Amino acid sequence: MTLSVYHYIENTWNSEEWKKGVLRQRFIEWRKEPSIVRLAKPTRLNRARSLGYKAKQGFVIVRVRVRRGGLNKPRPNKGRRPKRMGVYGYGPAKGYKWIAEERAARKYPNLEVLGSYYVGEDGLYKYYEIIMVDPSHPVIKNDPNYKWLQDPSNRNRVFRGLTSAGKKARGLRKSKGFKGTVKHKWSRKQKEREEKKRHEASKYYRLQRYDKIPGK
């Protein structure tokens, strides 16, 4: 079987030589650029094509840079131990890909987000490329595969969590696979009942429940 060019693009992108050589040099250049940059063509053509990108008028590729790490929570000035200060270990409820899509949509309010894909990350930032479509462009209007973006129900779809990254952050994909089935829920509840029964049968539970002296 003859392999397509996208197969070789993916293998090249996943190779360690590419990551340590070309991609690392690109990260150095991307840090000097603005956080939102419009591109002439996608960096990962195989991922862009799999998400619906076409090399035609009306399609725009935007690279967005998002800061890595958790939230910068303010450190309280009242007394408590450092573990309970609530400064470290807290991240955003949204995914970084969804945040990147929203920033691109605010930068280009006349475009709609079709999808996005991961490009890479360094020590400070994560980089995503956003596929955006102009629903008012004549080429898009006459394309039966993309004219659904003109529907008012799809306006500002990224801000309503209708993109792939938004649905994932909203938890709409948890039912896919074994974890969302009734059998999995039943087995999980059965495991909780067994753990509770085992705990109640322990000596610590009996002493804690019956050996307490009232008023002390």
Curated annotation (Swiss-Prot):
Chain positions covered by the region annotation Disordered: 170-201
Organism: Saccharolobus islandicus (strain L.S.2.15 / Lassen #1)
Entries under Pfam families matching the protein: Ribosomal_L15e
Encoding gene per record: rpl15e
Keywords: Ribonucleoprotein, Ribosomal protein
Family indicated by similarity: Belongs to the eukaryotic ribosomal protein eL15 family.
GO BP: cytoplasmic translation
Basic and acidic residues compositional bias, start-end: 189-201
NCBIfam families in the cross-refs: PRK04243.1
The protein's name: Large ribosomal subunit protein eL15
PANTHER family: LARGE RIBOSOMAL SUBUNIT PROTEIN EL15 (PTHR11847:SF4), RIBOSOMAL PROTEIN L15 (PTHR11847)
Classification via SUPFAM superfamilies: Ribosomal proteins S24e, L23 and L15e (SSF54189)
Domain of life the protein comes from: Archaea
UniProt lineage: Archaea, Thermoproteota, Thermoprotei, Sulfolobales, Sulfolobaceae
